[in-house]
Structures are given as structure tokens and as C-alpha cells.
């Protein structure tokens, strides 16, 4: 038994190896075929006996996952995964019985598989040799005819199955390796054939084939021999496999049209598959020869198609392509089906189209309904799901909300506690800071007292020295008086009476006390050297310059004393340096009104409310100014003069001005004259430099002397003359003095605002052309070019640059050494924290000069900025002391008294300590400042006279003015009291007063044009009726002329010769021949149709033939008619002939002699007559007709439709009229358009009538005028007026560019032929100096009176040599006269409301509607007595808001001009505006609110502060 079993096991193992070798052989064969297909695309050259073993073949197996190692690993993994499924018992049973895929092989590793492959390699090679032998034997047996032999039942089924798959391969090709395997081998699985053609069998366990090729079909798979034996053994069980049968029942066809029914060519699928045959097995010799013949015929057809051009060879696709109809370019007649053709013409559809459309529509409906149901179901399911989720998480969500609420409460409590502790910490710091400040304040007062005491002693020494110098030229008593007067002035009007002088002098230490009076004669007897020894310990403050001067020696004391004394006396003797003479004495009524009105302090002007002393925040950007009219002076002592009032000057000099009685005015003027004389004696006179072209006025020469003394004493200074006094020329004269006298040619640096950069350059070229001036501006590249070579000596003398560019290129400017640095408009350099201020401070300069047109401001930070810029360090007792370098200490010294001034306003004079501290502050700055006002030097300037010219309204103006006032809408507007509505009405009234054309333009008259006259409507109807009548007559009437029955007409046009020639042109014979041919053709067509009763239109051929027949009949009829016409025209014969009639006719026209004079006068061309009567036309052609008609020309010339003139003649005449020039064009134009007369421009306006008389007088006397107006449209009217009178003029308005203004002003100032310069008051004031004119005419007054003052200053300024006359035009009995009258009653300055040059709301807040309109105001106006602007309105508090409201009532051009003017005024803001970050103002309010919240818990706050003070908090 054991031996038999062993032998049986060996046989079984040998059989297993044989089967495995067979599988390996087939695997190699199939993989080689796939690789050959991939590489060469075709199997034509494929050799099955060649087994590839290259690297590319192995790479191909790895990429396609066909390697046996990978397949084995995948098979084992799949088996391991599928072993867990309990429903695959049948598959596991098959795997256990299998000899190849056993449970032992599943655990084999990669090395075992390679060993098995090597063991079966000889068997595989034997299989390969057998295949070679079979292939060679098969090639030898090809010539033998295959004989049919009986085959078994299984082979029949396999053959049928192979045939079936061959047919399916043609329709649905399968992978080639499967087909080759099926064709060449008989190792095919035995599967039962389906019983029906439409039944598909699907095996239940498809997963058993996953270990084999994935491309095998479901019905065929490869198995080992052991599996085949197992299948044969299991057949006896008769166990049926589960099958799925799919039975298809196609629907019955509903279309009954036999053309639409498709009949299959085969009755069953089996017959269809059996129709395919294999070339190798199933074909006989006859069938093969027949197949070869068919292929030959097909090939010959293809060649013929290529030769004929029906086919073409495509190289890209390597195939034959048919030729399209476009390429053939042949016309293919398309004859559609008659029924479809008939349907297409009527836009109908056949039955098939209806069915298809209905099916498409129904399918869309089904799809849309299905989608809608699915969407609704999804929505409902989501709602249900969300509901249950919400119900499930309610408790958890409630718990989370409670926890979140507890956390928020805890967080709020922690924040509140922390906030409270922070507040306590801030309070502790404030208390601690107050204590430290108190200590510093005590130390600062001691330091300040020492410093001011030394400054006071220095000033005493300077005054005594000046007294010595003045004694040589004047008596001692006079010098003492002058000295006392100068002392009174230098005290900044701290004294208003002799008693007050003594009191203040005792405090300040500057006046003549008994001790000082005793020392005075002793000092007078001493010389300069002895004074130096006596006051040597009083070392005055001197300026220490930048780093380059640190090694230089400091100036000696005598220089400081002389410079200080000279500058101080100069400033003391000029009454305008620290005292304002602008505030004249006011009468008792004004004083009483001022006493009644409450004073507004500086804190109210700031708009920030009152602040405590400790919390006062000084803002650098604010302008601490107090208007002279808003501050009242009160009595300082009981013995003070009653009419003296202390005012706080707006310029900010912290001074009091003394108002004297009218009787004392003369005494004051005499004192001023004596002071001017003393100034000339006290200041060292310097010669006028030769480089300067031009004459300096007296005060300008004194300014040069003062500037020269500053330079000689090595001191910086501030020239603060009022605007218009010539600070520019004084600066140029200083630089010229340095060049001529000191041989100091610079270079000097002048930093100016951008707007006046060009003005400075022009002033240098005008007054000092000897200087080399470098104007530094342009792009970065241009500025770089200008810097090239500027370090060379004498490259330039003066450099003019703007503030913006000097900061941008500060590195280049810092490297250069400058002699003098001049800052124009220096009052704008007030923010010491800005980079601009720091950059200018660090420049390498020897001297510094500040130019400002406004006095010093009250802001301590600005004062400190100027002091530090002039004196970065001071020297006291021979030591460097940064006296003003510490801003905090400076504010502590002077801040509290100035804060009291700001807070209390007018009551600051009651505080003696405050008054003395302010005086000390100005004593420090006094030696370095020079300021003069226009009022002080007005005797040296031309006088200014103002005249008011009243103008009557013209008739047209009065009519428009009264008509506007009488309107119901105007009355309602004035009665409403609305400010904007009233201003609109006032603006309209002002337009009427300026010129009526601004309110209502005088119209240009034209005639009313009618396209047709009245009779033309009836003529159209008549013409239509006549045409209808003529049409009926033409139908019934026979044309005899056409039939040659009117014989007399032939003699009118034809000659005998022409008639004979025309008769030869007859062609009747040709017509007859063509007609006969067409009739024969038509006869043939008629025979084809026969006697058909009706025409079948559904037959296209029959329809086309019928249409051709109809065309032939029409052609025959037309040719017959043409034959008759030709015959009638050629048969015309004249009786006599035109040639014979012309020969026998005599011309009766008389020829006139053209040389006769009488004939020439009678017969004149139209153009000559028009030229001769031109004067008559110009004189009397003035009446424009009210209405004209355009068709009258045709009626006058006889060119209308009803004219008896023929149509051809009318066309010729009309054409000639178009070609001929119209000599009556001028006459037609004058009668068509009536322009207003030019003289009406003047006589319609009363102001222009007065202006015409005034300009004639000014021109005769050699005067030149400036005419200003607010409205831009008035400039247009003035232009027309000046052109009408022939005046040379120039115009400047808001549209004029800034660079063009300089050219216009220079031309006007130099060209005396130009009489008038018309300007807009809104045209801007930058760069306009019109001193060439001596007359200013205000055609109308501006809303803003500051604009009028600015316009006056353009003419009345430095450089004017003649008296200036100002004429203001006012219309009588109008709004303008009422405003002027009210202004005179209130005694406003210069008849306009000007308050320190600012535009205030007093202009409207003090005027009511009744004041403006007078008796013309309606009686029912309820608010007539109320002011235009109430005190509570926003416009009353904000002038800018008022300007915006007025702009809404003005024209658009005027508003644009005003905006441009304001923009130019603020053009320099970019140079100076560098604001710092500020804290929000509402922080303090929040802190107060927080403190109020915890009111009543002081004990807790005290505990917290004590806790922090004891050091437990930190």
C-alpha cells in the first residue's frame, strides 16, 4: 500500500509539474506577444518561438504588474484577506483541492517561487521546441486541401464558441493575447452553451479568477489539468450553478410607415455570427479565390478613385480620405422630397419630428420631476435629522451656557478689580508727580530770579552806555528825558502813570530808583573801559553756535554790551516795537458798549473750555491770540487815568497799550518824532552798499543799521516788521553790506515758503543783480545737477530754497558751511519736535536771521522755540548754561503766569506777580527783536484816499430790481427768515446792480420760421386731386403721338436727313425670327403637358416645367411689343423738315449797343446794385420780421409745383441758383438776426456809465487803475466795455496760472500804455505787486471784507511813489447803499467789517433784513428786525461755515476762484504742517465718568493708595 501510494504521489507530483510548466509556457508566450504589440503595434513579424529576456522586457513586466513574483505576493495577500469572509466556503474548498494553489504554496516566499521556476525550466524549453516543430509542419501542410473529419461534441461546441467570439471581436475587440490563445490552443474551459441568444450567464464566484490575468472574460478562464479532472469528477453530482437570465422584450413599433420599419438581415444571432468565417480553418479554395478577387476589385476601385480625384492620400494619418463637396467645387442639385419641400416652405413639421419633440419634452419633464422629488426628500430628511440632534443636545447645551455665563461674570469682576487698581496707581503717580513738581518749582524760582537779575543788570548797563553816547550830541536834561521815555517804552507799557512806574520799577529793578539815580551821574562820568571794569561780573548772555564754533573764542563783553545797548535803545525808541498803535482812541459810546459786553478769554477762543492750572496742556500747533476788540482793560490803581485801557495785543507781545485822550494826540506825535531823532543818533549808521540798486526809506535804512549791528556784535536776531514794510529789501541790503564792507560774499542760505520762492529771486535780480543767486528747486535729478560744483569758491553767493526741499536734501545742506541763514515766515517754525526744526537747527551757519510778519505769539512752546533757535546755549559768569534748553523748566518758570493770562483774559492786570513775570520774559527777548508797524511809518508812505461813488440805476436795472422785489416768491422768501434763502435773494439783487445782463441777458432777436406758408396746406390737397384726375384721363386717352398720328410735331424736331437715317435702323425681321423660335419651343412644352385640367404642385419637375412655359409666353409677348414700337419709331416722316423751316425763318430780336451809357445804367448786374446801395441797406435794414416762410423763394422764382414752367427748366434754374453766389447775403443776415447794440452794454448799467466818465478822467491825468470785482462774469462784461471804448487792458482771474501772474504784473508795471488792469478779488494774492497803478476801483464789494483790504494792499505797498485813490461804486437806493449806510452808522473801520484782517460774522450778525432792504421789505415779514445770523447758529461761531453757506449762493466760477485763492493762501501748509500725535480729548471725560461711578467709596481708594505707597503693590 505504501509503495503504491508513494508511486501514486510521484505520478501526481510529476503531473503537477507538467501542468505548471504548461502554464509557465503559456505565460511566456502571452507576455511576449503583449511586449511585441507594445513595441511594434503589429503581430505580422512576430515569432512565437522567440522568448525575450532583455532588460526592457523585464521593465515592461514590472510596469504592467505581470511579473510572477508580484502576482504571487498579490495572490497570497488576497487569499489571506478573503479567508476572513465566511460566505466563500466554496472558493476555499476549491483552493484546498487544487494541487497548484494549495495552502502550502500560499506561505511560500519569493525564493521558493524562483526555485520552482528553475526546476520547470527544462519542461518549458521542451514545450518551445514542440511549438517550433508544429509551426514548421503547419507551413508544409498549407498546400493540402483540408478535409472534413468528424469531431467530438465538445470540440464542436468549442468551435462554435470560437466562431462566436471571432464575430464579437470584430464588433467589440478584446485583448489580442486572449484571441491568440483561443485560436492557437485548445486549452479552453468547458462551459455550457446558453440556450437562448439573449440570455447571459454570469458565474457566481468571479473572485476565483483574480489570481490570473485581469483581461479574461467572464465565460472563459484558464485552469490546470487537476482542475479539469475535478470538474469531470463532479459532473455526476448534477449540481446546477446559479445563473441570471436577462430576457429582453422589445416594444412593438408604433410607426406604420413601411419606410420606417427596419427589417433584420438575419433571423437570429446565431445566423449572424455563423456568417463570419475564418481564413485559416473554414475557407475552401474556391471561397479563398473569391475573397482574393474581391480584394483585387476593391484595390482597383481605390486606385481609380485616386486617379479621378474622388479620394486623396493623407500623409499625417496614413490613410485615404474622401474629397468634400467644397474641394470638388461641383454643383450638386438637391431635389428634396416634394412633400418635405412643401412642408419646409410653410414652416411645418412632419409626423416624425412631432414624435421626437414630444419624446424629448416628456423626458425633460420626468428628469425635472425626479430631481424635485429627490431634493424634497433630502430637505425633509435633513430637517428631521436636525430636529433630533437639537433634542438630543439640549441638556448639554444648557450646561455649557451656564458655564459660559459664570466665566463671563468672573472675567468682568477681574477686569473691574484690575481697572480699579490701575486707577489707584494713576492717582498715586499724579500725587507723587505733584510733590516732585513742587520741589522743582521752588528750585526753578531761585534759578530764575538769579538769571533775570543778571539780565536786568545787563540792560541797565546798556542804557547807561547809550546815555553816554547821546550826551555828546544833546543836553543832559534832554537825554535824561529821552532815557526815561525809552525806559517807559521798554517796560512794555507796564506803566500807565507815574505812580505805577515807580511801583513797577521797584519790582523789576529797571527804573530810576534813588540808588540808581545816584549812580547815574557816576556812570556818566566814566568811560567805556571803566564801565567794563565796573560791570565786568555781569556777563551777558551770548549765543553759542554750532559744533564748528566750539573751538573759537567767545565774543568779548564790550561787544555784547554795545550790541545789546544799541539794539535795546533802537527798539526802545521806536514806539511800534512793542506797543501797537493800531488801536486808536475810542469815544465814550464805544467804551460804554465795550463795558457792557462781556469779555471772551483765550480759553473760550480755544474752544476747549476752562482747564485747571495743573492740567493745562499747551499745544504747539495752536495760535494763542487775543483780539484787541475782545479784551478790556481795567484800572490797576486808584490814581490811574480814567480813559486808559489795557489791551492784549493780538500779535502776542504781552504788552499793554495806552489809550490817550484826543487832546493828547499831538503830544504823542511830537514825542514819536523826538524818538525817531534819538534813534538816528543812538544806532551806528552804516553806508548804503554800492551793490544795492534802489533807494531805502528811512525806516528801512534804520533796519539795515540794526541788522549790521547784530552782525558786528556776533548776535542773531528777529526782524518782525509788519507785512508790507520791506523785510526782503532790508535782508538784501544786509547781504550787500556784508559783501561791500566786510568782504563776506557768503554763501548765504535763504529758506522761504514755496509760494514766494520766485518773488525772492526776482527781488535779488531787481535790487542786487551783482549776486550769484542759486534758486534750488526741481526734480531730484535737476537738484543733483545744481549741486554739482557748488563747493567751489564763489560758485554762488546766495542759495534760495523752500522749507520742503531743504529738509529732503538736508544732508547736502549740512555739509556746506553757510555764513548767514535767513528764515522767511519764521513764525511758522513753531513745532520744535518736527524734523524740519531739528534739521535747520543743526545747519553749519555763523549767523541766523528770522523774518516774520506777525509778532510773537502767546504760546510758550513757540517762544521757547525762537529763543532756543537764537540762543541754543547761554553763558553766565563765564560758564555755559543751557538756560532755555530745558523746555519743562522754561514752562515752569513762565507757564503759570501766562496760563493765568489765558484763563482770566482781561483781569490779568490785577495780578502784580503775573505782570512782572511777563515783563521779565520780554526782557530776555527784547535785545534780539525789531518790529515796526505801518502806522508808525505811514508818514513815509504815500497817502491813501477812499471815495464812494454813488451810481443811479438805469431804466432796465430799475425795472428788473422792482420786478424781482415784487414777486410773490421773493416776498415769501424774505418773510421766512431762512439765511440761505435770503442770501440767494441778495445775490440776485447784487447781480442786477452790477449789470442787468447777469440777471437777465438781453435777447438776440430772430424771426419765427415756418416751413410752409398758409396756402401750402391747401395746395397739397389740390395737387393730389389734380393728379387723380389726370390719372383717370390718361387711362381713357389714346396717345396719338405714339401712333404717329400727330404729323405736325415731326417738323419740330426731325430733319429730312435724320428721318431717312432712322428708317434704315428698323429691325422687325430679327424680332420675327426670335419670336418664331420661342413659339416652337413653347409648342413642344404644351404638347408634353397635354390637356391637363390642373397642375400637381407636389411634383417639383412638373412645377418647374410649367414655370418655364409661362416665362416663354411672357418673352414672346414682350418681343412682339418691341417689334411694334421699333416699327412706329422708324416710320416717322416730317412734312417739310426742320432744316427747311429754319432756313425760311427770320430772327426778330434787336441787338443793343453795349457801349451806350444809358443802357449800362439801365442794365446792371445784381451784385453791382447791391454794392451801390450798401449804405441804404446798412441804415434801413434794421427791422427783423416777426415770422418768415421758407417756401416763399420757390413761389417768388416760379419754381413751385404749380408753376407753368416745365420741370426740366425748373431743375436747371435751381441748379444755377446753387452755383451763383448770393449777393443779398448781408441783407438777409441783417433782417434775420437782430443783435443788441454795443452801446446798450454801457447804457443798461449805471455803474458802467460812471466808470466810462471816471476812466476818461484818469487817462487824461496820466493815472492807471485796478478794477476789482467779486464775480467772474462781471470781468467778461468789463472786457466787452473796455474793448468798446478802445482801452488797453489786462485781465487776471482765478483761472490764471501762478507762473503767468508774475509775467502779467511785470508787464503792467513796466508798460505805461496799459491803462486798466481788471482783476477778480478771488484771484489770489501770491506774487501780485501792482505798484504801477495808483487808483483802485471796487466795482462791487466782496462778502469777505478781508479780500477788499488785500486788494488795496496790492497797490498801496512798498514801491508806490504816488498817492493811492480808492473808488468804491455803490448803487443808489439799493441793497448796496443800505449796507454802506448801516456800516457808517456803526463806525466800522473803512466802511467794512475788518477785525485784524480776519473774516468775522459781525457782517451778518449785526445786520438785519430790514437794514439791507429798508422800505422795500414787505410789511408781513415777521423776522425783518432779527439779524441774519443768530448767535446760536453754527455759522455765527465758525467763519468757515459761513463761507460755505455763501458759496452755495454764488456762481460756480466764483466758487472755484475762491477755492483756488484759499488753496494758494494755504499752499505753504505743506512746508510748515508737521503735526505730532495728540491724545484723545475724551480720555479725561472717561476718567471723570469712572470716578463718579464709585462716588462714596473714598475709604477704599485711600486704602488702595496707601497700599501702593507702602510698596506692597509693586
Curated annotation (Swiss-Prot):
It comes from the Eukaryota. The keyword Transmembrane does not apply. InterPro entries: Helicase_ATP-bd, Helicase_C-like, HSA_dom, INO80/SWR1_helicase, P-loop_NTPase, SNF2-like_sf, SNF2/RAD54-like_C, SNF2_N. GO terms for cellular component: chromatin; cytosol; nucleus; Swr1 complex. Residues 465-524, 538-641, 1469-1490 are annotated as: Disordered. Catalytic component of the SWR1 complex which mediates the ATP-dependent exchange of histone H2A for the H2A variant HZT1 leading to transcriptional regulation of selected genes by chromatin remodeling. This is Helicase SWR1.
Amino acid at each position: 500500500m505504501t509503495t503504491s501510494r508513494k508511486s501514486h504521489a510521484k505520478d501526481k507530483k510529476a503531473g503537477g509539474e507538467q501542468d505548471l510548466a504548461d502554464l509557465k509556457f503559456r505565460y511566456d508566450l502571452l507576455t511576449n506577444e503583449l511586449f511585441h504589440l507594445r513595441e511594434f503595434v503589429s503581430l505580422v513579424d512576430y515569432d512565437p518561438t522567440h522568448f525575450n529576456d532583455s532588460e526592457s522586457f523585464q521593465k515592461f513586466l514590472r510596469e504592467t504588474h505581470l511579473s510572477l513574483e508580484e502576482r504571487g505576493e498579490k495572490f497570497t495577500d488576497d487569499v489571506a484577506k478573503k479567508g476572513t469572509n465566511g460566505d466563500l466556503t466554496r472558493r476555499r474548498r476549491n483552493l484546498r483541492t487544487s494541487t497548484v494553489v494549495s495552502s502550502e504554496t500560499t506561505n511560500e516566499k519569493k525564493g521558493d517561487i524562483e526555485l520552482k521556476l528553475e526546476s520547470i525550466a527544462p519542461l518549458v524549453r521542451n514545450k518551445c521546441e514542440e511549438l517550433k516543430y508544429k509551426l514548421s509542419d503547419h507551413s508544409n501542410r498549407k498546400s493540402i486541401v483540408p478535409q472534413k473529419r468528424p469531431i467530438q461534441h465538445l470540440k464542436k461546441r468549442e468551435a462554435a464558441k470560437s466562431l462566436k467570439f471571432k464575430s464579437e471581436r470584430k464588433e467589440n475587440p478584446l485583448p489580442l493575447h486572449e484571441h491568440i490563445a483561443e485560436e492557437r490552443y485548445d486549452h479552453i474551459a468547458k462551459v455550457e452553451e446558453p440556450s437562448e441568444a439573449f440570455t447571459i450567464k454570469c458565474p457566481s464566484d468571479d473572485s476565483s479568477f483574480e489570481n490570473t490575468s485581469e483581461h479574461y472574460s467572464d465565460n472563459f478562464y484558464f485552469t490546470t489539468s487537476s482542475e479539469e479532472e475535478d470538474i469531470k469528477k463532479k459532473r455526476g453530482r448534477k449540481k446546477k450553478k446559479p445563473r441570471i437570465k436577462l430576457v429582453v422584450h422589445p416594444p412593438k413599433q408604433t410607426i406604420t410607415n413601411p419606410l420606417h420599419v427596419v427589417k433584420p438581415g438575419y433571423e437570429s444571432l446565431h445566423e449572424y455570427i455563423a456568417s463570419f468565417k475564418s481564413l485559416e480553418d473554414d475557407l475552401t479554395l474556391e471561397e479563398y479565390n473569391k475573397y482574393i478577387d474581391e480584394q483585387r476589385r476593391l484595390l482597383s476601385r481605390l486606385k481609380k478613385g485616386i486617379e479621378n480625384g474622388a479620394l486623396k492620400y493623407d500623409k499625417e494619418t496614413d490613410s485615404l480620405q474622401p474629397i468634400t463637396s467644397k474641394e470638388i467645387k461641383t454643383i450638386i442639385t438637391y431635389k428634396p422630397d416634394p412633400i418635405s419641400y412643401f412642408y419646409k416652405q410653410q414652416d411645418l413639421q412632419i409626423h416624425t419630428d412631432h414624435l421626437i419633440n414630444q419624446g424629448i419634452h416628456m423626458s425633460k419633464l420626468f428628469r425635472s420631476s425626479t430631481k424635485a422629488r429627490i431634493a424634497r426628500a433630502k430637505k425633509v430628511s435633513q430637517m428631521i435629522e436636525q430636529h433630533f440632534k437639537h433634542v438630543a443636545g439640549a441638556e448639554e447645551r444648557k450646561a455649557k451656557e451656564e458655564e459660559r455665563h459664570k466665566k463671563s461674570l468672573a472675567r468682568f469682576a477681574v477686569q473691574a478689580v484690575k481697572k480699579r487698581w490701575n486707577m489707584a496707581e494713576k492717582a498715586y503717580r499724579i500725587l507723587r508727580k505733584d510733590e516732585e513738581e513742587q520741589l522743582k518749582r521752588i528750585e526753578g524760582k531761585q534759578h530764575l530770579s538769579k538769571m533775570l537779575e543778571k539780565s536786568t543788570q545787563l540792560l541797565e548797563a546798556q542804557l547807561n552806555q547809550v546815555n553816554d553816547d547821546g550826551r555828546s550830541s544833546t543836553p543832559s536834561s534832554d537825554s535824561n528825558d529821552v532815557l526815561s521815555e525809552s525806559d517807559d517804552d521798554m517796560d512794555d507799557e507796564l506803566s500807565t502813570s507815574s505812580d505805577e512806574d515807580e511801583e513797577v520799577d521797584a519790582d523789576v529793578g529797571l527804573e530810576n530808583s534813588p540808588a540808581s539815580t545816584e549812580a547815574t551821574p557816576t556812570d556818566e562820568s566814566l568811560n567805556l573801559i571803566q564801565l567794563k571794569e565796573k560791570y565786568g561780573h555781569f556777563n551777558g548772555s551770548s549765543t553759542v553756535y554750532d559744533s564748528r564754533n566750539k573751538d573759537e573764542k567767545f565774543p568779548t563783553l564790550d561787544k555784547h554790551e554795545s550790541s545789546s545797548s544799541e539794539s535795546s535803545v533802537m527798539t526802545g525808541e521806536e514806539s511800534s516795537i512793542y506797543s501797537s498803535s493800531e488801536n486808536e482812541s475810542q469815544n465814550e459810546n464805544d467804551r460804554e458798549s465795550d463795558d457792557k459786553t462781556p469779555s471772551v478769554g483765550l480759553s473760550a477762543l480755544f474752544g476747549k473750555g476752562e482747564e485747571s492750572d495743573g492740567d493745562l496742556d499747551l499745544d504747539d500747533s495752536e495760535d494763542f491770540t487775543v483780539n484787541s476788540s475782545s479784551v478790556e482793560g481795567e484800572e490797576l490803581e486808584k490814581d490811574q487815568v480814567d480813559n486808559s485801557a489795557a489791551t492784549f495785543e493780538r500779535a502776542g507781545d504781552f504788552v499793554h497799550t495806552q489809550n490817550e485822550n484826543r487832546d493828547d494826540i499831538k503830544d504823542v506825535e511830537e514825542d514819536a518824532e523826538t524818538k525817531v531823532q534819538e534813534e538816528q543818533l543812538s544806532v551806528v549808521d552804516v553806508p548804503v552798499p554800492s551793490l544795492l540798486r534802489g533807494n531805502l526809506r528811512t525806516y528801512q535804512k534804520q533796519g539795515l543799521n540794526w541788522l549790521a549791528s547784530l552782525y558786528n556784535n556776533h548776535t542773531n536776531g528777529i526782524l518782525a516788521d509788519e507785512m508790507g514794510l520791506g523785510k526782503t529789501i532790508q535782508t538784501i541790503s544786509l547781504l550787500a553790506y556784508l559783501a561791500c564792507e566786510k568782504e563776506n560774499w557768503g554763501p548765504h542760505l535763504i529758506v522761504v515758503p514755496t509760494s514766494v520762492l520766485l518773488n525772492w529771486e526776482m527781488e535779488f535780480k531787481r535790487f542786487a543783480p551783482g549776486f550769484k543767486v542759486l534758486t534750488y528747486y526741481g526734480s531730484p535729478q535737476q537738484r543733483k545737477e545744481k549741486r554739482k560744483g557748488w563747493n567751489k569758491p564763489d560758485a554762488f553767493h546766495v542759495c534760495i530754497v523752500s522749507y520742503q526741499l531743504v529738509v529732503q536734501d538736508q544732508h547736502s545742506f549740512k555739509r556746506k558751511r553757510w555764513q548767514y541763514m535767513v528764515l522767511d515766515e519764521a513764525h511758522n517754525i513753531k513745532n520744535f519736535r518736527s524734523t524740519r526744526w531739528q534739521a535747520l537747527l543743526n545747519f553749519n551757519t555763523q549767523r541766523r536771521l528770522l523774518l516774520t510778519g506777525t509778532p510773537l505769539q502767546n504760546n510758550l512752546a513757540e517762544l521757547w522755540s525762537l529763543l532756543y533757535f537764537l540762543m541754543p546755549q547761554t553763558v553766565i559768569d563765564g560758564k555755559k548754561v543751557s538756560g532755555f534748553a530745558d523746555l519743562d523748566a522754561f514752562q515752569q518758570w513762565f507757564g503759570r503766569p501766562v496760563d493765568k493770562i489765558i484763563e482770566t483774559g482781561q483781569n490779568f492786570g490785577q495780578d502784580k506777580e503775573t505782570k512782572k513775570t511777563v515783563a521779565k520774559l520780554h526782557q530776555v527777548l527784547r535785545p534780539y527783536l525789531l518790529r515796526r508797524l505801518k502806522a508808525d511809518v505811514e508818514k513815509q508812505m504815500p497817502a491813501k484816499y477812499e471815495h464812494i461813488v454813488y451810481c443811479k440805476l438805469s431804466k432796465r436795472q430799475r425795472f428788473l430790481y422792482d420786478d424781482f422785489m415784487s414777486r410773490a416768491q421773493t416776498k415769501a422768501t424774505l418773510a421766512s427768515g431762512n439765511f440761505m434763502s435770503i442770501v440767494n435773494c441778495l445775490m440776485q439783487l447784487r447781480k442786477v446792480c452790477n449789470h442787468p445782463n447777469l440777471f437777465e441777458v438781453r435777447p438776440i432777436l430772430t424771426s419765427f420760421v415756418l416751413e410752409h406758408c398758409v396756402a401750402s396746406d391747401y395746395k397739397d390737397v389740390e395737387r393730389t386731386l389734380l393728379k387723380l384726375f389726370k390719372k383717370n384721363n390718361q387711362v381713357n386717352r389714346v396717345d396719338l403721338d405714339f401712333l404717329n398720328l400727330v404729323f405736325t410735331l415731326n417738323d419740330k424736331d426731325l430733319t429730312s436727313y435724320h428721318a431717312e437715317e432712322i428708317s434704315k435702323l428698323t429691325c422687325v425681321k430679327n424680332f420675327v425670327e426670335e419670336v418664331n423660335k420661342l413659339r416652337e419651343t413653347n409648342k413642344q412644352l404644351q404638347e408634353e403637358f397635354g390637356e391637363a385640367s390642373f397642375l400637381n404642385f407636389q411634383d417639383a419637375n412638373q412645377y418647374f416645367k410649367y414655370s418655364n412655359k409661362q416665362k416663354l409666353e411672357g418673352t414672346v409677348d414682350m418681343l412682339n411689343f418691341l417689334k411694334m414700337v421699333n416699327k412706329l419709331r422708324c416710320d416717322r416722316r416730317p412734312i417739310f423738315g426742320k432744316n427747311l423751316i429754319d432756313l425760311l425763318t427770320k430772327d426778330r430780336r434787336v441787338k443793343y449797343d453795349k457801349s451806350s451809357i444809358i443802357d449800362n445804367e439801365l442794365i446792371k448786374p445784381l451784385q453791382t446794385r447791391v454794392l451801390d446801395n450798401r449804405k441804404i441797406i446798412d441804415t434801413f435794414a434794421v427791422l427783423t420780421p416777426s415770422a418768415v416762410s421758407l417756401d416763399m423763394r420757390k413761389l417768388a422764382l416760379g419754381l413751385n409745383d404749380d408753376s407753368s414752367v416745365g420741370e426740366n427748366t425748373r431743375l436747371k434754374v435751381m441748379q444755377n441758383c446753387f452755383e451763383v453766389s448770393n449777393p443779398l447775403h448781408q441783407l438777409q443776415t441783417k433782417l434775420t438776426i437782430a443783435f443788441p447794440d454795443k452801446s446798450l452794454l454801457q447804457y443798461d448799467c449805471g455803474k458802467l456809465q460812471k466808470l466810462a466818465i471816471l476812466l476818461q478822467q484818469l487817462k487824461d491825468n496820466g493815472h492807471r487803475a485796478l478794477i476789482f470785482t467779486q464775480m467772474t462774469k462781471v470781468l467778461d462784461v468789463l472786457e466787452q466795455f473796455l474793448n468798446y471804448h478802445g482801452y488797453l487792458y489786462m485781465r487776471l482771474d482765478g483761472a490764471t496760472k501762478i507762473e503767468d501772474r508774475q509775467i502779467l504784473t511785470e508787464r503792467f508795471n513796466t508798460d505805461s500804455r496799459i491803462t486798466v488792469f481788471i482783476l477778480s478779488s478771488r484771484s489770489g494774492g501770491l506774487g501780485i505787486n501792482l505798484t504801477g497803478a495808483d487808483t483802485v476801483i471796487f466795482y462791487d464789494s466782496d462778502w469777505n471784507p478781508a479780500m477788499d483790504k488785500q486788494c488795496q494792499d496790492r497797490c498801496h505797498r512798498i514801491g508806490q511813489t504816488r498817492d493811492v485813490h480808492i473808488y468804491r461804486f455803490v448803487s443808489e437806493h439799493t441793497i448796496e447803499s443800505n449796507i454802506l449806510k448801516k456800516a457808517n452808522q456803526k463806525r466800522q473801520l473803512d466802511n467794512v467789517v475788518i477785525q485784524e484782517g480776519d473774516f468775522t460774522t459781525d457782517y451778518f450778525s449785526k445786520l438785519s433784513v430790514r437794514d439791507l432792504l429798508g422800505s422795500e421789505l414787505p410789511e408781513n415779514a415777521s423776522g425783518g428786525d432779527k439779524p441774519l445770523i443768530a448767535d446760536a447758529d453754527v455759522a455765527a461761531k465758525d467763519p468757515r461755515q459761513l463761507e460755505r453757506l455763501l458759496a452755495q449762493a454764488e456762481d460756480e466760477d466764483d466758487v472755484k476762484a475762491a477755492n483756488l485763492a484759499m488753496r494758494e493762501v494755504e499752499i505753504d501748509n505743506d512746508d510748515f504742517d508737521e503735526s505730532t500725535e495728540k491724545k484723545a480729548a475724551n480720555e479725561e471725560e472717561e476718567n471723570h465718568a469712572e470716578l463718579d461711578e464709585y462716588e462714596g467709596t473714598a475709604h477704599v481708594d485711600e486704602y488702595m493708595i496707601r497700599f501702593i505707597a507702602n510698596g506692597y503693590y509693586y
